[in-house]
Amino acid sequence: KVVHLHGGELTLGAYDDAYRHSITKFSYLHFTASKNYRRRVIQLGENPRKVFNVGPLARESISHVKFLKKSELEKRLKLKLKQNLILATFHPEIGSEEKNKQNLMNFIHVLGELENVSVLFTSPNLDFLGNEVKKLLKEKIKDFENIAYFESLGFELYYSLMRFTKCVVGNSSSGIIEAPIMGVSSINIGKRQEGRDQEKTTVNSSFNKSELKNKIEKVLQQKKQSKKNIKNVSK
């Protein structure tokens, strides 16, 4: 028998939905991340008595992390973290290679032109156009001193960094799921994550450079969110 975690979710800008819903159909038990996702699994024909809303798994992962101090992070990463720190990720969206390249270029230029800001870019998924995007990303960030690239940070480093982050920016589910749990604001760009439930700490933007720059600057001026003030979409 198969147990399915995080079923019922939508990501309209990626190919995940077809696989996710297929797994739902041959699973026996379902543990979803929100009430809306539970409803969707039931709409797909699953027995409501076997569908449970338990919230995102990331909450459990974060609760077991031994967070590193800022000094330890700087030592491990071999760089100085500014007060305004941004965690950034770009995954390819469904569409043409040229469109994805242009979106990434806009994203990099906006981040690179921010003043008094450190940007840590993590690697894109190696799915649709992933290798092409990673190659372009690693090449273009060389033009900007405030941007550093890390292939993989792992849970401990990533979540520890998030404690000192002013904003998570990009089109990764991390900005929609993990960032609110940590009390961190996020900017979700483009359509890759379109369809997911969002907290009030998430701001949406296109890849238009002026719009994106304006929204990042506004978020950087805000105080860090209090976890107790964040609406829990799992309820």
Kindly give the residue locations of the regions a language model identified.
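A donor-sugar binding/catalytic signature common to diverse glycosyltransferases
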Residues: 1, 5, 30, 154-198
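Short, ordered loop/turn segments at secondary-structure junctions
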Residues: 7-10, 35, 124-125, 191-192
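Short gly/pro/ser/thr-enriched loop/turn and capping motifs at secondary-structure boundaries
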Residues: 9-14, 38-39, 59-60, 176-178, ...
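A conserved, positively charged/aromatic
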Residues: 11-28
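A nucleotide-sugar donor-handling region in carbohydrate enzymes
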Residues: 26-100
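Short acidic-hydrophobic, aromatic-tinged amphipathic segments that line or gate anion-handling sites
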Residues: 32, 52-54, 149-151, 203-208
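Leloir-type glycosyltransferase catalytic cores
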Residues: 36, 203-235
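Donor-nucleotide binding loops and adjacent catalytic segments primarily
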Residues: 68-164
